[in-house]
C-alpha cells in the first residue's frame, strides 16, 4: 500500500526559493506534497495538523517546541543587514504609541519587541503589508519579505531600521528567521531528511535559476535578488546559527514572549 505524501509547507517569499525549487521538482518522488503559504499561516497550519512539517518562524517553534522536532542543518538566517525585515517609523522610538505589523510575520514582531524599549502601553496591530495605509493611523510599521524590496523613495521623515542588522549590532549573533519543524508524531525517514538537506545545497547552487523563475518581484534587477540570496541570506543551521537561535529563545522567555524555555531538539 502506498504511503500518503507528507504535507510539507514552505513560504512563498524569495528567500525560500533555493529550498523550494528542488522540493517542487523532486519532492513527490521523496514522499512530500509541497504547499506554499505565508510564514504565519504555515505556523498555524502546522499547529492544527493541516501540515506534517513546515518552514515556520523561529518564535513559533519555541512556542510549541515540545510538539516539534527540527531538521538539522537547514534554516533561513541572516547575519547583519538583510533588507527584508524593516521597521519604519515617523517618530523617535520613545514616542511611538502604535505599530502596524505585517500580518504575515511572527518572528519579526517578537524581534521588534526585543530590540527596542517601547512604552508599556504600545499597541501592535496586524495589517496587510501596505506601508501607506499602515502609517495612516499608526506611528510605525513593520514589513517583511518581498514587499520590502519595493519600498523606495520613502518620505525623508521616515526612519528605517533593518531588524537583522540591529540584532547583529546589539548581539553580534546570527539571526534565524525560520526553521524546518516536524510534528513529533510524524515519521521522517533518513532519506527524506537527507533529501531536505541536499535540496538546500542544490538550491543554493542554482540561485540564478531561482531568480529567473521568480515572478514575485517584477522590476527588481536580477543581480539585486541574486546578491540578496547569495550574500544576505544563509541556509545552514550551523553552530553560529544555533547560538543565535538559543539566544533568541532565552530573550523571548525573559521578555514573556514565550511561556517556557525549551532546549532545541532535532530529529
Model-derived regions, located:
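Pocket-lining segment of extracytoplasmic ligand-binding domains
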Residues: 128-214
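A bilobed periplasmic-binding-protein/Venus flytrap-type ligand-binding module shared by bacterial periplasmic
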Residues: 22, 84-93, 98, 175-190
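Ligand-binding cleft/hinge of the Venus flytrap
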Residues: 18-30, 108-127, 208-212
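Secondary-structure end/capping motifs
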Residues: 187-251, 255
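Beta->alpha turn/N-cap motifs
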Residues: 14-15, 38-39, 50-62, 74, ...
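Short helix-initiation/N-cap motifs at beta->coil->alpha
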Residues: 33-44, 121-139
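A conserved helix-loop-strand patch within extracytoplasmic ligand-binding domains
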Residues: 74-131, 160-162, 166-168
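Short, well-ordered beta-strand elements
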Residues: 2-12, 32-35, 97-102
